Amino acid sequence: MALLCYNRGCGQRFDPETNSDDACTYHPGVPVFHDALKGWSCCKRRTTDFSDFLSIVGCTKGRHNSEKPPEPVKPEVKTTEKKELCELKPKFQEHIIQAPKPVEAIKRPSPDEPMTNLELKISASLKQALDKLKLSSGNEENKKEEDNDEIKIGTSCKNGGCSKTYQGLESLEEVCVYHSGVPIFHEGMKYWSCCRRKTSDFNTFLAQEGCTKGKHMWTKKDAGKKVVPCRHDWHQTGGEVTISVYAKNSLPELSRVEANSTLLNVHIVFEGEKEFDQNVKLWGVIDVKRSYVTMTATKIEITMRKAEPMQWASLELPAAKKQEKQKDATTD
């Protein structure tokens, strides 16, 4: 019976009886994500593309490992007994002070409000990167490589979550089990947008079996595919919500981010002809006039000022709440 190898960067299935000291090629280090660059602590290679990161060949050989890494242990919280709680109660007379009434929530504005383009703030790093691209664009046109359909033995599949490598013509007929979505890292949790099996352990995330079946993608063909997915994340403070879109070398003159109090439309052109589009029905209400966009060489940050200082349960309004808001609007 074939077992799954849990060594980082391997993910292959192996026969325990034929497992040898050099059967596995893996990474002994840990994944490193810094300034949109992804790599392994044991290797010097870095990339901005998550699929390329997953396909980085291991730098160490050893035996396959079938032992699944343990999930991080959560500390056990013990409650004291009722008897102890009674003893902890103060013996003096308590004076209860009533808290002030909470501020009434702002009524949700209509989604049909006119959209406004948010202010774009362009960083010096992006300006320098775009200037370099303009200088080298003329030379690159003369140095374009001719399309070559030949696939080299050992080429990794570019589909997310697939660890298969090209072994010959028979690999063209194999069924690829992969993740059709994009990886999401939020508040310590890691998961794919297509199946949302969340985990806090990176090795378990890499070992998650795909949720979609199709053909292997041995080469990336961006030609003719303008609209592409981008890894994006969000976080919040008491007064602001920030969305980070990891798109490199975005073009300010072709990009736009527009919003009203409850809707956000994002259109970003980056790396030449790639486009990213996202429309979000916001969970809360924002102050459009005090919201803005910061564009850097490695990402775009959309900073939205909250209309009221409250914690958002999520970035996007759930489908059930959307229907309730629509019903309220029709009855009014």
UniProtKB/Swiss-Prot annotation:
CDD domains given in the database record: p23_melusin_like
Region of interest: Interaction with PPP5C: 2-77
Residues annotated as binding Zn(2+) 4 are H179, C194, C195, C211
Q: State which tissues express it.
A: Underexpressed in many breast and lung cancers.
Q: Which residues form a coiled coil?
A: none
List, alphabetically, the InterPro entries matched.
CHORD_dom, CHRD1, CS_dom, HSP20-like_chaperone
Indicate which residues the UniProt annotation says bind Zn(2+) 3. Answer: C157, C162, C176, H216
CS domain spans which residues? Answer: 227-316
Instruction: Spell out the SUPFAM superfamilies in the cross-references.
Output: HSP20-like chaperones
Q: Where is the CHORD domain?
A: 5-64, 157-216
Q: Where, per the database record, does this protein carry N-acetylalanine? A: A2
Subunit annotation: Interacts with HSP90AA1, ROCK1 and ROCK2. Interacts with HSP90AB1 and PPP5C.
Instruction: Give the protein's function.
Output: Regulates centrosome duplication, probably by inhibiting the kinase activity of ROCK2. Proposed to act as co-chaperone for HSP90. May play a role in the regulation of NOD1 via a HSP90 chaperone complex. In vitro, has intrinsic chaperone activity. This function may be achieved by inhibiting association of ROCK2 with NPM1. Plays a role in ensuring the localization of the tyrosine kinase receptor EGFR to the plasma membrane, and thus ensures the subsequent regulation of EGFR activity and EGF-induced actin cytoskeleton remodeling. Involved in stress response. Prevents tumorigenesis.
Task: Tell me the protein's name.
Answer: Cysteine and histidine-rich domain-containing protein 1
